[in-house]
Regions:
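Predominantly the C-terminal beta-signal and adjacent terminal strand-loop region
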Residues: 27, 38-44, 228-281
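Short glycine/proline- and aromatic-enriched beta-strand/turn motifs that initiate or cap beta-hairpins
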Residues: 24-85, 122, 274-276
Length: 281
């Protein structure tokens, strides 16, 4: 299964047509002009924008008795800053990104934050245009993730990641991401057994653009079918808004860095703010 996933990822990442090598290329100038106009339209979008989903949700354990120790608020903010237009080699562009996730114990005395996870990085992306259509995006990125804690609560690792997105239709996107880990945290040497080596999933919008459904499976280290599962279902508040009422389900390990070895099955409800286009994962 791992081999099939890697083959699929490679196809997505390198599936850019190479002219004049066993292909019949017709009206190449016109096709190039169309591709340039697509990139120009994408480059005209704001340099600063949302990256991954931003959300604020609260909930409790699924399949157990809720109490103040297993009920919490979880929120995430995520944004990116594009540094260039897509005029670097291979029509790629450079960008910075930052994601911060928090687990907040709002039912305990003094409302303490249980864990804060910081995920900055830099990426190089290329839009994939085939047959005069935008069909995907390929990205290589360097990212860091840590929780800013000291002593035995400290968690930290780095990743060189390869990611691909395939835009199957205007309302359906499949995504995959594989990372080469560099684990530098003293107290999370075995993090791959819980937080995984690669992930795959999809994002789908209803035809009326009111509903959005995400599903991501994160494969943990090992040959067993051991996945962390994240499912999100959102309903758009109004037609012209990027705000949704969301139900989020998490099942598995690695939901936060501090508790990466702990199994969680949580259901949460709240507000989702997502990009106008498909989200990044």
């Amino acid at each position: 299964m791992k081999l099939k996933f890697i083959i699929l990822l490679i196809v997505v990442l390198v599936g850019v047509p190479v002219p004049a090598r066993g292909q019949i290329v017709t009206d190449s100038k016109s096709s190039k002009q169309i591709a340039d106009s697509i990139r120009a339209e994408l480059d005209s979008r704001p340099y600063f924008s949302l990256y991954k989903d931003t959300y604020f949700v609260g909930g409790t354990v699924l399949g157990g008795t809720p109490d103040k120790y297993n009920s919490d608020v979880k929120f995430q903010i995520s944004f990116q800053q594009r540094l260039t237009k897509s005029n670097l080699p291979w029509n790629s562009y450079l960008y910075l990104f930052y994601t911060q996730k928090a687990i907040w114990n709002v039912l305990e005395n003094s409302l303490p934050f249980h864990d804060l996870n910081f995920n900055p990085g830099v990426g190089l992306s290329k839009y994939i245009i085939m047959k005069d259509k935008l069909v995907g995006k390929a990205t290589v990125m360097i990212e860091h993730e840590s929780n800013g804690r000291a002593g035995t609560a400290s968690r930290s690792w780095n990743k060189v990641s390869l990611a691909g997105e395939a835009y199957i239709s205007p309302s359906l996107m499949a995504h995959a991401k594989y990372w080469i880990p560099i684990v530098d945290g003293k107290y999370n040497r075995d993090i791959l057994r819980y937080s995984g080596l690669y992930q795959a999933g999809f994002q789908a919008m209803s035809l009326d653009d009111k509903w959005v459904l995400d599903m991501t499976l994160v494969k943990r280290k090992g040959w067993d079918l051991n996945f962390n599962t994240i499912v999100q279902l959102g309903y758009r508040i109004n037609h012209n808004s990027n705000q949704f009422i969301m139900l989020q389900y998490y099942n598995g390990y690695g939901e936060s860095l501090l508790d990466f070895k702990q199994y969680h099955s949580r259901i949460r409800f709240g507000l989702l703010i997502r990009p106008r286009f498909f989200s990044d994962f």
